[in-house]
From Swiss-Prot:
Residues annotated to bind L-serine: T252, A253, E254, E306, T406
UniProt xrefs under NCBIfam families: serS
Broad enzyme group: ligase
GO MF, one annotated term: ATP binding
Native species: Metallosphaera sedula (strain ATCC 51363 / DSM 5348 / JCM 9185 / NBRC 15509 / TH2)
Gene that this polypeptide is encoded by: serS
A GO CC term attached to the entry: cytoplasm
Domain notes: Consists of two distinct domains, a catalytic core and a N-terminal extension that is involved in tRNA binding.
Protein task: Catalyzes the attachment of serine to tRNA(Ser). Is also able to aminoacylate tRNA(Sec) with serine, to form the misacylated tRNA L-seryl-tRNA(Sec), which will be further converted into selenocysteinyl-tRNA(Sec).
An annotated GO BP: selenocysteine biosynthetic process
Name of a matching Pfam family: tRNA-synt_2b
Protein name: Serine--tRNA ligase
Localization annotation: Cytoplasm
Subunit structure: Homodimer. The tRNA molecule binds across the dimer.
Residue positions binding ATP: R283, K284, E285, V299, E370, M371, V372, S373
Length: 455
């Protein structure tokens, strides 16, 4: 049964070591796994030879005299004892080898730029007309080198989303949320709350129109499952655990959707399976103590629409591009200008073989901010969750590939709208594509969100 990491340690260990070096991961554990696998295969050959000997001895027994039969029966028993001991040794070595391999990150795809951190990420395309404050033009151009962006210079610098939300529009309150829930929580009111609902409806409309099945997943997962979906040792400070329970709050709908076929086989003709999930996302953000302290860009709880695909291994790279294309369609509809970035090897999460980020230009901050993360996890999650495909026509089995992408993370999309669609009087233009989802509600805003007195 194919599994990319196991195939590499057997057939091309140098390639695996190179992948680990690209991620700045010490290859020592992988080298141990290579040695364990060599030992495992050598013992397996011994076992197969012993089984053959046992079969030969057993086949001779019926034709022997009673005295000779007794000797052969004893010989067969001794062989079985040796086989049993060797099989136990095999299982122990196999478990040790696989446990090591489970700690390793996915194999980096050849098209991923090599570098230790996000400064090596490579912008590969831009879309839209960028609004750039006159004093930020050089900074903007430095972030889109070689991509020939279309941009207009504006004379006023938009207010940052945090101040726009709370001081100008007066439709958010992070101070009171901080008092009652802690930092990085928020209240959203009226027009901005309606805007969030429209974003969700719009994203679901776009993705389900492409044949993706809508799912509302569990908001918690058991420890065994979450450890299979993510590298829990690395991310244990990023996700919330329920005290006294073997349950974790999900950080994205990706995780429970990935677990939809936990320890199951999927008929090959059913693949690909496309899903779009709607859920809250809960994140500790422990590693971001001093980042984005104001506003709603980086918060502990937000709503998110997530795309997910289970595919055959040979098809996963085309579906990676499909997921990115879907996300681009959503942000093009919102008319939010963005760049797509190919994430560097040192900035990839353990699950992903390759990842794109879609980053929207934020004119008040004079920088691009991540809105979408789009990953091909190949068989990294599927092996850990034991999700296999069965192709009866071609008489083959293997592990499926899993892919995921944000469709929209509502709070981040709201921050992008507040900065990009802001007028000099503080009003915010509602994207035209969202207006049909607001028209049906009497109290919802229709064309603009305008500053108001705090109630």
């Amino acid at each position: 049964m194919s599994w990319s990491l196991l195939e590499l340690i057997r057939n091309n260990p140098d390639s695996l070591m190179e992948s680990l070096r690209k991620r700045n991961v010490n290859p020592q554990l992988a080298e141990k796994a290579v040695e364990l696998d060599k030992k495992w295969r050598a013992i397996l050959q011994e076992v197969e030879k012993l089984r053959h000997e046992h079969n030969v001895v057993s086949s001779q027994i019926p034709r022997l005299s009673p005295e000779e039969r007794k000797k052969k029966i004893e010989e067969a028993r001794n062989l079985l004892s040796i086989i049993e001991a060797k099989e136990k040794e095999l299982k122990t070595i196999e478990e040790e080898r696989d446990n090591i391999l489970r700690t390793l990150p996915n194999v980096v795809h050849e098209s991923v730029p090599v570098g230790p951190d996000d400064s090596y990420n490579v912008p590969i395309k831009v879309w839209g007309k960028f609004r750039v404050y006159e004093k930020d033009v050089n900074e903007f151009l430095s972030q889109v080198k070689g991509l020939n962006p279309d941009y207009e210079i504006i004379k006023f610098k938009p207010v940052g989303h945090a101040d726009e939300l709370e001081a100008v529009l007066k439709l958010g309150n992070t101070a009171k949320a901080g008092e009652v829930a802690g930092s990085r929580f928020y209240y959203l009111f009226e027009d901005v709350a309606w805007l969030e609902q429209a974003l969700i409806a719009y994203a679901l409309d776009v993705i389900t129109s492409k044949g993706y099945s809508l799912v509302i997943p569990p908001y918690m997962l058991r420890g065994e499952v979450i450890q299979s979906v993510i590298d829990l040792d690395t991310f244990k400070d990023a996700i919330y655990k329920i005290e006294g329970e073997d349950l974790y709050l999900i950080a994205t709908a990706e995780h429970p959707i990935a677990a939809l076929y936990f320890k199951e086989e999927i008929e090959a003709e059913r693949l690909p399976l496309r899903y779009v999930g709607l859920s809250p996302a809960f994140r500790k953000e422990a590693g971001a103590a001093n980042k984005d302290l104001k506003g709603i860009f980086r918060v502990h709880q937000f709503n998110k629409v997530e795309q997910f695909i289970f595919s055959l291994p040979e098809d996963s790279w085309k579906f990676h591009e499909e997921l990115l294309g879907n996300a681009e369609q959503i942000f093009q509809g919102l008319e939010l200008p963005y760049r797509v970035v190919n994430i560097a090897s040192g900035d990839l999460g353990a699950c992903a073989a390759k990842k794109y980020d879609l980053e929207v230009w934020m004119p008040a901050q004079a920088k691009f901010r991540e809105m979408v993360s789009c990953s091909n996890c190949t068989d990294w999650q599927a092996f850990r969750m034991k999700i296999r495909f069965v192709d009866r026509k071609k008489n083959r089995k293997g592990f499926v590939h899993t892919l995921n992408s944000t469709a929209v993370a509502t709070t981040r999309a709201i921050t992008a709208i507040l900065e990009n669609n802001q007028l000099e009087d503080g009003s915010v233009v509602i994207p035209k594509v969202l207006r049909p989802y607001l028209e049906r509600f009497q109290r919802a805003p229709k064309d603009y969100i305008t500053p108001r007195k705090k109630s």
